[in-house]
Each structure stands twice: as C-alpha cells, then as structure tokens.
Regions:
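N-terminal amphipathic, basic-rich helices that act as targeting or association modules
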Residues: 4, 8-80
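Glycine-/charge-enriched secondary-structure boundary and capping motifs
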Residues: 2-15, 19-21, 25-38, 177-178, ...
Length: 784
C-alpha cells in the first residue's frame, strides 16, 4: 500500500472507523486522507487508544491524594512512599491477543506493562496478574491456560522480576474471550520521575530497542473489536516478545535517564510508533517530524504504513536534550540495542512523516491527540437480582448419623468434575427449617461433601500448578507471595525497613448481579487484602473489562460499575492513579461477565510487622471481626453447590469497611494477632479452612453467630476478617473493638488436625488438603 493509493470509506471501515468518524476526518483535513494518514487516525481513534466510550465516565474517579505524585494520563501512576522514594504502577490488559495466541499474547502483555513502569524511571520490582478463563470443560480452556501461564512465566522469569500475587477464575462466560490483566510495580526516586511530554521544539527524537517488523500491525484496532468465528485469522496482529531484549532495554533506559540526557520518553506500546510520537508531541503542544527511512527495520520493503502501525515489542522513543545524541549512542551501543535519530520536534503542530523522499503524512496533531471522538453512549439501568432470604436457601444435610464426615466427597481428582448439588436440609438450633437440598446429581450432599467440593472448585482450588511456574523470589525481596498464605503479596523496598503490599481483585459474579455493588466490592476487597497483611492502602490502578459499549445494557454495566468503584475510592481514601479500559470483549454477540479488576498498592513502614494467615498456633482464639447476616446471593456456595447463579450480591457498607479495616490494622500494629484472613469467596468456613491449611493446625468452632448454619458458614457478607490471637490478648481486642464500635464474635480455638464445627462436621486436614491441592494438577495433566 502506498501513500498515493486512493482511500475509500470501505478502507476506513476495514481499519475500524465508523462512517461518521471518517466524515469527521474529512471535515478536519478538508481533504481525503491517504492510506498512511488514515491508518494513523484509525489507531489513535480506536477504543483502545482514545477511550472514546468510557472517558466521560472515567472522570468520576478520585485521582488526587496526599501521596499522589502523578495520576492518570501518564504511562503509569506515581505515589509517594516516604524517604524521597516513589512507587510507580499500572495494570493493563492483553485480552484479545492472549485468546488468539496465548503464549505470545500473555508474554507481551507482561513486557508491555513493565515498559509502562520503567519508562517513568522506575525499576520494576513486582508483577501481578488477574486471569479469567472459560469453563474447564470447554475444549479450548486447557490449552489457553497452559499457553498464558507459560507466557507470563517465560517473560517475567527471564527479565528477572518476581510474580508475587494474582487471581485466576474460570467461568463459561469467558469461553470466547479470556482476560489476561497484567500489573507491574516499580521503584524510583521521587524527584527523578520521567514524563512523556515534549518540552519544546527543535529537539532530537531517538528510537532505540529492537528493530521494527510486521508483527502486531493494527493490534490496537483488533483490541477494539469483538470476536467472531474467524478470530484465528487475526493471529498476525499478535506481537512477538523477546524477554532478553526487554532486560537490555530496561538497563539501557535507566542508564540513559541517569545520564541526564532525557527530555521526554515514551514506550512504543499499542499503535507503536504512531501513538508514542503523537502522544509526546501532543502533550507538549509541539509538532513532530519523522524520517521513516532511519527507523531500524528487521524486514525488507516495509512501507510507511507498516512502520507506523507495527507493534513490534521492546522499543522506546525518547526526546533528548540538545547535543546529547552521543551520550545516547554510547549507552545503546553498550547494551547492544538498535538505535537511530529518526526525527525532531517542531513548531508546526503537525505530524509529518517522510519516506523515500516523499512526505507520506502531514496532518494536525490536535484531532489525533485531544480532539478524538468522544461518545456519550446510551445506557440502561442493569436489571438487578432480588435479595435471597438465607432461610429459603437449601442447606447441606447431616448425612447418616452425626454428619461428622460420614460420606465420601466428590472425586476431586476428576479433572472435568462439574460441581454437584444435592438434596436434604440442616439448620442451626435457632433458625427456621430450610427447603430440601436440590442437588443436580440427584444425591444428598453432606456438610463434609459441600466443603470439600467448594475447596476443590476451580475458583478456590490451589493454583500451585500455576504459580510454581513463576519465579517469585528473584531480586530476593519477596516477603509474601502466592505460596506463603497471605491476602496480598509483600515486597521489601530494598535497603529499607519498608515494604509494598500488592493485590488484584474482582468478583465478576457480583458485578454481573449488580454492577454498582460489584464495583464497590472490587475496591473494598482490594482494600481489605492490603489491610489483612498490615499495610496502609494507598492507591489503585484499574482494568475495566466489558463487552460492546454500543449495546445499552453493556454500557449500563460500565457506567454503574464505575459509579460504585468511584464511591468506594472516595470513602476509603483510595485514589485511582492509572488504569486501562478493555471493551468489546465478546464473541458473536455474547459478552463476558463484567470484570472491573482492581490492582492496589499499600505501604508497610516496617515489614517486620507484616502478617498473613499462616501463623495460627494451637491454643489461639479464633475471632470474627464484623457482623454476619448470611448473604448467600451470588455466592460461591449457591453456584458451586446448588448450581444457581442468582440473587443480589452482599451489600457493601463503606463506612463499616473503613471502621473494621482500621481496627484490624491497629491490632496488627500492636503485635496482638497471629493470623489474619479477609472473608470473601466461600465465606467463613473457607477462610477458616485456608487458615488451617496454611498454618498446618486444625480449628474447632463451637460458637457460631446467630442464623442458619449454612448462611453463617458460607455467606459472603462484606467487611469481615477472621483473626487469631492468644487468649491473653482478648481484653485488648475487646477494648479496641469497643472504642471503634465494631462487632466481633469469638468462634473457637485452634488445635488438633481437623476443621470442625460443633454438632455439624469435622474434616481432617489431610482430606481438606487433598481437595484443595488436587484439582488443578489433575485438570492440567488430563489428556486433551
């Protein structure tokens, strides 16, 4: 394709532009664009780059705070962590590429998010991920899991950055669109942050990193479209990563910054050279002129269109200070990187591209950068689920005799095990009878079976198979990771007593049932997870994953989820400093469950005071912080045991969240607690089982809160923590809880080798561990 080729509305549509958008281009230019210019417009106006459907609503987020140095709008967010140091972090999606080509899609997602962080002057110190796959029985799921996990581990391990936390879910709603959200956290000096805005005209523009190839062309456009049955044909739009080149790029970039030569810098991510050059010039209010013949190329005969839209990985664009080209050349040569001066900033306000002696693009930057189309799309209020009365939700049965483990559990090593539900009832003494238990398999399910089934379900079961493929301890600063029994990863700030706590969270089934409450809960759970390791929650990044925003019901999910998240951020003093929006996650008109993922960072001033849920000791007292109502709507129990996905999610009272979290954090700082676990999926009984397994100590609960036993044990009420403390600390707890006005309930004690509730069940730790550890390896090792 040449610059002389005629552009048509059909070509614009092929590039992802709507007819009204093409008409807008004609009006702005007062002429027809050539194919190169049209390609530039198409990627800069894509949903992926412009946020044209969501930008109106993203403004609801609070983005400032006492620790915020830089909020949304740059490559990543920056927060102050004291002592002249800053934490730089962001989360971003690589959903569409990972479905098409799972290994490279996931690997380049990791590489891209690291570049966002070190582009601002930070050394990456931690990686996280949030993964959503389809139903385990779907024919593509196992291959996608294998490829994505290998890609994440293969890239992060080679670069030498530990993967310390994350979450993995399975649901049929992701059969046609998996989600791969990657997060990176880095450290920098607070007074040495680098930004992307070009400071003035007349400065050299330098390309460095890997050569440009034809991989990833129109990747940003592909990420702004839904899939259909021909999705595999989009494989050429997936980028190919080289982690060893990334490692060299990190070192060269940080050395270049330390030399004082950098005036502005931007990585080449989505839309490649187009977005990096347009954003740098646009933010600085200058023009930019590039000589594409000077761009390092790994393939012959590349056109201007291909070079501008390529998304080849491990590339950077820098604007250097006057006369500093030689410094850059020396550093790039040292690290073996391709590099060239490919242009300059100008006073014209135009994007000018030259190739083979011709001007192949000459368009104003304004409509590309700050005058892209913005839509106020129509939306409708989501249809909400009614609240479920826990007394009307079936309970497990006592089974034969006492119910103390009398029936064998479902075979947890069956890799294609579908959750089973059964028939009978059980109530606590003070609750009305519950209805018969309608198990889909037609068999009665006991308490023992229900608990083992939940522990072995794909969303809860140990992901050891997965995280053992990640290097969690490279850099030697990891204090808590996926293996240590904690609600958040914890990484030491090297050479100090400080540590950063990091987590990623979302409960899609809550957002599906009520986007507003689900949005609040995603933020609140991230806040709880940081609290549960002893950290002060500071700020969040987000990754908003939704379907097609042109459908009013999907746009309604987006609007209300953002509303809920924004309210939670304000109430918890938890500003949003960076983020990403991934839309059009649907195939043949079937959208994913709405998944607004939250990545969060907290600070421990003394990492010696960190805590997890694996420190339980025999004789410790188990205490539940927070009130128990027994909310079973949209719960894991309802889905995995009863085969239902209905009911309103548990409501989130943000004032109560803050009160209870502040109480727990204060108790941790006083050194009173042995173990802390926030309550989430599966409620109290799963939190107790996970604490017992991590600590290798049993628990016995002989005094449950009031209510139907199954609602008390499986209910997912929010703002709750399970804590363990010595007997002699109870008086201090009572005083602190009284001062805070926070309810608590003494449940029982630690000891023995069972998880037991008086008069209901007792399950040996070995059986619990077999259920918890068995599903994932059995699934991944099963024949295809």
């Amino acid at each position: 394709m040449t610059a002389r080729a005629k552009t048509t509305a059909d070509l614009a549509a092929e590039y992802g532009l709507k007819p009204e958008e093409y008409a807008r281009i004609l009006k702005r230019l007062n002429r027809e664009p050539n194919p190169v210019e049209l390609g530039v417009f198409s990627v800069m106006w894509s949903e992926h780059c412009s946020y044209k459907s969501s930008k109106k609503h993203l403004g609801k987020f609070p983005t400032t705070g006492p620790r915020v140095i830089c909020g949304p709008g740059e490559n990543a967010g920056v927060i102050d962590i004291d002592d002249g140091q800053a934490c730089i972090f962001k989360m971003e999606s690589h959903n569409h590429p990972s479905y098409i080509e799972p290994y490279q899609g996931a690997a380049t997602g990791v590489g891209g998010i690291m570049r966002d962080v070190f582009t601002m002057g930070a050394r990456p110190i931690a990686l996280l991920n949030a993964l959503r796959f389809g139903d385990p029985s779907h024919p593509k799921t196992r291959r996608l899991v294998s490829g994505v996990v290998a890609g994440i581990g293969g890239y992060g391990n080679c670069v030498g950055v530990p993967t310390v936390a994350g979450e993995t879910n399975f649901h049929r709603g992701y059969d046609g669109n998996i989600l791969v959200n990657a997060m990176c956290v880095g450290l920098a000096d607070a007074d040495k942050i680098f930004y992307s805005a070009a400071p003035s005209a007349g400065l050299p523009v330098v390309y460095f990193g890997s050569k440009t190839g034809r991989d990833g062309i129109h990747g940003a456009t592909m990420a702004s479209q839904e899939f259909d049955d021909a999705s595999d044909e989009k494989r050429p739009t997936v980028q190919v990563g080289d982690p060893f080149a990334e490692k060299l790029l990190i070192e060269a970039t940080l050395e270049l910054m330390a030399s004082g030569a950098v005036a502005a810098i931007q990585d080449m991510g989505a839309a490649g050279l187009t977005s990096s050059s347009v954003e740098m010039a646009g933010k600085g209010g200058v023009g930019i002129e590039l000589d594409l013949d000077a761009v390092p190329q790994r393939e012959t005969g590349m056109t201007a269109y291909e070079m501008m839209l390529s998304e080849s990985q491990e590339r950077m664009l820098a604007i250097l200070k006057p006369g500093r080209e030689a410094d850059g050349h020396r550093i790039f040569e040292k690290w073996g990187l391709d590099a060239a001066v490919i242009g300059k900033t100008t006073e014209t306000g135009q994007l000018v591209l030259k190739h083979k002696g011709e001007t192949v693009c000459d368009i104003p930057l304004a409509p590309l950068f700050d005058d892209a189309p913005l839509y106020d799309r129509p939306w409708v209020e989501p249809v909400l689920q009614p609240r479920l009365d826990p007394a009307h939700v079936p309970s497990p049965s006592m089974g034969e005799g006492s119910g103390l483990g009398v029936n064998a559990p479902t075979d947890v090593n069956d890799p294609m095990r579908r959750t089973a539900s059964s028939a009978s009832l059980e109530t606590s003494a003070n609750a009305p009878p519950t209805p018969p238990f309608p198990h889909r398999g037609g068999r009665e399910m006991t308490w023992r079976q229900a608990i083992l089934t939940l522990l072995a379900c794909p969303d809860v079961a140990s992901k050891r198979w997965l995280w053992e493929q990640y290097d969690r301890h490279v850099m030697a600063d990891t204090l808590h990771d996926s293996a240590t029994g904690a609600d958040a990863g914890v990484v030491r700030v090297h050479g100090t007593k400080k540590a950063l706590a990091v987590t990623s969270d979302c409960t899609p089934r809550y957002v599906q049932a009520d986007p507003y409450e689900g949005g609040k809960q995603a933020v609140a759970e991230a806040w709880r997870n940081l609290t549960a390791v002893g950290a002060d929650p500071i700020a969040i990044t987000d990754n908003l994953n939704f379907g097609n925003p042109e459908r009013p019901e999907i746009m309604g999910q987006i609007v209300r989820a953002i509303d809920g998240m924004a309210e939670a951020c304000r109430a918890l003093d938890f500003p949003v400093v960076s983020g990403n929006v991934s839309l059009y996650n649907e195939t043949n008109g079937s959208a994913i469950p709405p998944t607004p993922t939250v990545g969060a960072v907290g600070l421990l001033s003394d990492y010696a005071k960190r805590i997890g849920y694996g420190g339980l000791k025999a004789g410790d007292v188990l205490v539940l912080i927070g009130a128990t109502v027994g909310e079973l709507g949209s719960s894991l129990y309802l889905r995995e045991i009863l085969g239902r996905e209905d009911g309103a999610p548990p409501p989130v009272d943000l004032a109560v969240e803050k009160r209870n979290g502040d109480l727990v954090r204060g108790l941790i700082r006083k050194g009173l607690l042995r173990a802390v676990h926030d309550l989430s999926d599966g409620g109290l009984i799963l939190a107790a089982a996970e604490m017992a397994l991590a600590s290798k100590v049993g628990v016995f609960m002989d005094d449950l809160p009031e209510g139907p036993a199954h609602a008390v044990l499986f209910g997912e009420d929010q703002a709750r923590y399970l804590i363990a403390l010595p007997q002699d600390a109870l008086d201090v707890l009572d005083e602190a809880a009284g001062d805070a006005g926070a309810p608590y309930h003494v449940l029982g004690r630690a000891g023995g080798c069972e998880v037991a509730v008086k008069d209901l069940f007792a399950i040996d730790l070995d059986d619990l561990r077999a259920a918890y550890e068995g599903w994932m390896p059995a699934y991944m090792d099963a024949p295809a």
